[in-house]
Amino acid sequence: MLKIDGLTKSFGSGSDKLHVLKGIDLELNRGELVALMGPSGCGKSTLLNIIGGLLPADGGEIKLQKRTYGLKGPSSVVDLRRDLVGWIFQDFHLLNNLSALDNVAMALELSGTNSTEAEQLAAEALTKVGLEDRMHHIPDQLSGGQQQRVAIARAIAGNRPLLLADEPTGNLDIASGKEVLQLFKDLCHDDEKPISILMVTHDPELASSADRMLLLRDGKTEASDIRSAWGLDKEQDGEEE
């Protein structure tokens, strides 16, 4: 569903040039929840920004369904962001004066969907995330976990096949974080329209509950587990020596 080959990205120039991504190879299957971990500043958010069409790479290629991209700027991949990729952040970015339904519908209307269809798609998305009885509530009337569910509904409305989640539980308590993770699993394993989720997180419990975990380190990704993601294997090796 998503395939990345040899993706590279640097910032700066000359002696100050910083090579952040050094040949990323990554695959994400349909209906799969993958956690991406790594030390702060290793390029996790940079990678998500490139996959999401917000930042061009220096080299390499991305294939998402039938779309090939990666090296062009955001203005060249507007359709990608509109039709194929949804975003979730730790901040909900909801408009406080609008209901949950209107928050989701407005995002669809801004991408070109007519108001009648936008409202229908918004209602379907909110139902899918378990907020069918909270559609007409404004954000202040919702818990933190419910607000994040509205943000998730906004991201998946219109049947986007890929969801990029950057620290999605960062502002939630433990219980709400677990609810969001379970929702992610339900969305990925949906019998009719499964989506794929690439989730950046520093939470080891969250990461270990994903279908698969990747570690971004030294500019490349590799299959991982919790011990290696936190550097515990290296510590153990040092003790044995």
Question: What is each model feature region?
Answer:
Residues 1-209, 213-216:
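ABC family nucleotide-binding domain
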